[in-house]
Structure formats: C-alpha cells, structure tokens
Design a protein with these regions (language model features):
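Extended, compositionally biased repeat/scaffold regions that form elongated interaction surfaces
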Residues: 339-608
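Terminal low-complexity, poorly structured segments
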Residues: 19-20, 348
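Non-catalytic cap/lid and distal C-terminal segments of serine-dependent acyl enzymes
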Residues: 2, 11-17, 24-340
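A generic structural-conservation signal
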Residues: 10, 122, 166-167, 192, ...
C-alpha cells in the first residue's frame, strides 16, 4: 500500500471517528452530518478520567464555542444509580487555565469531596473573565460566562447528570467575586455562596483600576470590554456590595487572610511579611473589601459567616483550607450529609482492599453489581462474584469502564486484575465481555467482539494495527461498525467480518465514501503486490496502490473481469491510474499502459 509507514496519520483515524456515532465509549463521537454547531447548548464530548471524575465539552450557544466542564461525582453515584445530588459549582481564580480547574490542579478538591454526596462542577478556562457576560469580544474571546453557568449548563446537568436544582457556588479571588455576583444577579438560583479572598466591593475607590490592571496583567484583557469604563452601570451591576440585598436568604460564607505571612508562606527579610509580595497586597485588598461587604450585610440584618484569619496571603493552600472549613455550612444549605462515608469491609472484598492500600478508604458498603457485588473506594472500585473472583478496577481503565456502564454494560464483571503489557507502554484489564487497553497516548479503549477477535489473531498490540485509539462505533450509512487503531481502522459487518484498512488505501476508501460507497465493507486484510504495491478487497471491488500509480479502485463487474484476463497488475496494462468513469455508451478505466472500455457489456482493451 503506502511506504509502510510506522503510523498512519492521525488525521485519517480521527476522520473515521468523526463519521460515526459511539456505541460503547467514554468519549462520545460526533457524526459527520452533525458537524455544524448546534443552535442550543449541548454536550459534544465526554471523557471519563476515573470512575468518579468526568470531563465534558459543552457547546455554549452564547459563546459559540465548546467549554470544558469537569465533574467530581457524588459519593453514592455508583451505589445508588437512581439517586440525584445537589450541585456545588467551584470557580477558579484570575489566571484560570484551559487544561484544568485550579481546585483540582492546585488544591485537593478531588480528594476532599470523594466522600461527600454532592456533584462538584468545575468549569475550565475563563482567564480574567470574572465569569460574567462581557459587553464586547476581547483578546479572541466572546465571554458570556454568566449565561453559560446560570442558563445553559444547569439544564444539561439536571437532565443528563443526575443533578438537582439545589445549587451552591464558591470561588477564590476572581471566582469569589463572581460567586457573589452570580448568586446576587440570579435570585433563587443558589442556596449557598462562598467567597475565599474575593474582591467584594468592585466600585469603591481604586478597585476598578486594580481590576483593570489585573486583567491586563493576566492574559492582556481589557476590562472596558467586560464592564465598560469605570463608573459605568455595568460596574455597579457587578458589585457584590451593591447586590447585598439580593443575597438575602442565601447561606453565605466569606473569608480572607490578613496579608501577613502564615503557615504556608516563606518569610521575607522583613518581619511578618512573606516573600510573595503580590500575594500580600492582593490579600490585603481582599480583606478590606470583604470587611466592607460584611459590614453592609450586618446593616441589612443579613446573616453571613465571616472567617478572618490573622495571617495568610493570596495563595492556594489557604483556599484549600477554607474549602474544608466551609463544607459544614455548604452541606447544610444544600441538604446533604456533612459527614464522610459510613462503611466497613467484609467478605471477599475485604481481603483485596486490605492488601491494596492504594485504593484508599471505602466510600460505600457492598451493593449489587450484575451477578456479583461491588464496593466503592476513594481511588477505585472492587467487584466480586463467585464466577469471576475479586478484582479492583481503577484509574483511566476504571473511568472507561464506568463510562460505558460498568458491570451492567456488555463488558460485565472484571475477570482479571489490571496488568502491564510486554512493551512496557500499555496496560490492560480483562472482563467477561471483552477487555480495556490503555496507553498514555491512546487513552483507555474497550475491545470486544469481532474486533477483539481479529485484533488478537493479528497479535494484539504487537500486531500491525497497534493499540486502539477510539471505541467501537456504528457506521453511519450501513449496518456495521468501525474501530480506529494507531495504524488504521477496522471495519465490521455481519457478512464480511472485521478487517483493517490503512494508509493510502484508507485515503482512497475515505474519498469514495467508506462503506457507503459502491465498494462496501472490506472483506480481507491488505495484501502485497509487485513493485511494492498493496491492495485491499471489498464487497464491491478492490483498491490498488503502488508508489508510481497511486491508489485507485477497481469495481467488480465486466471491467474487473477484463483486467483479470489481462493478468491484473502483472499483465500488460499494469496498475490502475484512475477510477472508472463514464464515457458515451459505457465506462472506462485507465491503467499505466492502456485503458479498458466497456460498452453494452462488451470490453475493449486499448494499449498506449
């Protein structure tokens, strides 16, 4: 076929995946016919990072772009599959990054909330946005975060992610300001709001200038594109101090340090001061604005829990501390148990859990799972049945397993432990109905049925296909399936079985329309020909490739029969150099040293 490249271009593999609808995958593919952006907000892709942490890309109609949102699933998510849980939205700081929310990147929200019965929602990105709807686009972004977080995202979480309409929001610094604004500007939306070191007076003397400077420093954003010129109506509309009355009835928690060096700071040469000069100044601003905000609430007789620490700068360890300190109040407002899991170990699962201390503490008692039982732990789940034994499922493999439905899916219960593979690169785990394979580059992918059988015949990951890079998916045009691998996808139908197509032959197959073309599904593996050529057979014909001729299809019928009489590529005509095309009264196909014309069922061979 091609130059025997070690790896087929990833664009081909992704092109295949984009034409299909995922059947069994933690990553939801988008059909080719649905590539146009939806009119309304919708989830475009889901990736399970573990059995308790999910990343989804939600198309925001307001921002006309997909927004990554991560979720930390409630403690009882797996043990009580019919239950719904309150939502706790956690907002990032000014320098929010596009890869991960700071609450999991720089603090331990994932560990802390593992045994809490709340769905934690972590929007990713939004640097310098203050999570608000901007007046105009700026710096390549059309920020409409308030619309996204208050109108577009909640219905999706309630419909598809077992989340109730009982909501709370908390954030640090910029996110603390935004938390108060979202709650105040959207009465009734939030039951609980917390600000850790937030700027809670945005219009007082010097604050607009400070925010303007901060936005310019963090990403080069113009605050005038956000709220207009200082003193304008949008600044007042986004000032928690001025929104105080609208926060009546919301459970509130605010905190800040003093700016003096604390337990998480490195002392400077000046007594009591940290080397983190910027963090010192920012925390002093946060403290002053928080105190002013609390004074306003007291005048209005609106209750608030204020925690003023005698030390501490504007940095993550203190916000991690406040996250833990405020949980009891958050849990009460959200109507969930503030305590951790109440569970113990017993039976066959106990022995494994005690030996595998990496699992962490238990999060549930045993509960039914298919024909066996399961128990949840902080870093994975353990399954047991008399027929399959006792096995832990964790990490990215555990995430994929949970994403496809776990024990209730066609995979069934695990039949072995996760093991490393001989190449030192990948890992796999076997289940009743298939296996899951993982590498850092390809992620964790399910292998089952005809694809697993054919892949096994070819040597699994050691064979020519390499590792799977996507889940099995339905072919969009005909009854069949496709699964992408590092070196070309396999196509399957009930009549043809599973066969791989790769390289330039795959390019040609794609150009013709894959299985929806006259060629249909592949019926055999690619085979070598003379002059470094390759070919693949399909239901309706073949695709031939050589370095000099390129890749072309020859369809079954009179033209193929005549070329066969001439000896195929070994005959005087050589390899094809075109697909068949219509001519007056028939069809024609060109070859390296001639052409064949078929008219009225009669073939004519012409040399060059």
């Amino acid at each position: 076929m091609s130059k025997h490249r070690v790896r087929a271009p990833m664009r081909r593999i992704l092109g295949i995946a984009a034409t299909t609808v995922a059947l069994l995958s933690p990553v939801v593919a988008v059909p080719a016919q649905a590539q146009a952006q939806p009119v309304t907000s919708a989830v475009q892709r889901v990736e399970w990072l573990s059995d308790r942490r999910v990343s989804m890309w939600v198309y925001s109609a307001a921002m006309n772009t997909p927004i990554q949102v991560q979720m930390l699933l409630a403690r009882d998510w797996h043990a009580r599959p019919d239950a719904k849980f309150p939502m706790l939205l956690m907002l990032d700081g000014l320098r929010a990054q596009d890869d991960e929310n700071g609450w999991t990147k720089d603090a331990d929200a994932e560990g802390f909330y593992a045994d809490k019965n709340v769905n934690v929602v972590l929007p990713v990105g939004g640097q310098s946005s203050w999570y608000s709807d901007w007046l105009s686009p700026d710096n390549g972004h059309t920020y409409k975060w308030e619309t996204f977080l208050t109108k577009e995202l909640p219905p999706i979480l309630e419909r598809d992610w077992r989340t109730t309409d009982v909501r709370g929001v908390q954030g640090l610094s910029m996110g603390g300001t935004a938390a108060m604004n979202l709650a105040g500007r959207n009465p009734g939306l939030m039951k609980y709001v917390a600000s850790y070191s937030g700027l809670l007076t945005t219009t007082t003397l010097g604050m607009p200038q400070a925010i303007t400077f901060a936005n310019k420093d963090a990403g080069g954003f113009d605050a005038a594109a956000m709220w207009g010129p200082p003193g304008g109506p949008e600044w007042a509309a986004h000032d928690p101090y001025l929104l105080a009355e609208k926060l009546r009835g919301v459970s509130m928690y605010v905190s800040s340090g003093s700016g003096l060096a604390g337990t998480h700071d490195q002392l400077s040469e000046m007594p009591l001061l940290s080397e983190n000069w910027a963090g010192t100044g920012l925390e002093i601003l946060a403290r002053l604005s928080t105190e002013n905000f609390v004074t306003k609430l007291e005048k209005l007789s609106i209750p608030v829990q204020a925690n003023y620490r005698p030390s501490g700068t504007h940095t993550w360890p203190y916000w991690d501390f406040e996250m833990r300190q405020s949980w009891g109040q958050a849990a009460a407002a959200l109507g969930t148990d503030p305590n951790g899991a109440n569970c113990g170990l017993g039976g066959a699962i106990a022995g494994l859990a005690q030996a595998a201390n990496w699992l962490g503490g238990c999060l549930s008692a045993e509960y039914p799972a298919a024909t066996g039982v399961a128990q949840d732990f902080q870093h994975g789940r353990v399954f047991h049945s008399a027929a399959t034994g006792t096995h832990a499922v964790a990490g990215r493999i555990g995430g994929t397993y949970a994403g496809v439905g776990g024990a209730a899916s066609p995979l069934g219960l695990p039949t072995g432990d996760e093991v490393g593979l001989p190449d030192g690169r990948g890992r796999m785990q076997s289940f009743e109905g298939g296996s899951i394979y993982w590498t850092p580059e390809t992620g964790a992918q399910v292998m089952r049925g005809a694809f697993l059988e054919e892949w096994g015949k070819q040597g699994y990951e050691r064979g020519p296909a390499g590792y799977p890079v996507a889940a099995e998916a339905a072919t969009p045009s005909r009854d069949g399936a496709v699964q992408a691998f590092e070196h070309g996808p396999m196509f399957y139908s009930a009549t043809t079985g599973a066969h791989r197509v790769q390289g330039f032959v795959l390019d040609k197959y794609a150009q013709l329309g894959f299985e929806n073309s006259p060629l249909g599904f592949p019926v055999a593996e690619e085979a070598p020909l003379k002059d470094l050529g390759r070919y693949s057979r399909f239901e309706g014909g073949n695709i031939y490739w050589s370095p000099l001729s390129g890749a072309w299809s020859v369809r079954n019928g009179a033209l193929m029969e005549e070329w066969g009489k001439q000896g195929f590529e070994n005959g005087r005509l050589g390899f094809p150099v075109s697909d068949e095309f219509a001519v007056p009264g028939g069809i024609q196909q060109n070859f390296q040293t001639g052409f064949i014309v078929v008219r009225d069922g009669k073939s004519e061979v012409h040399g060059v």
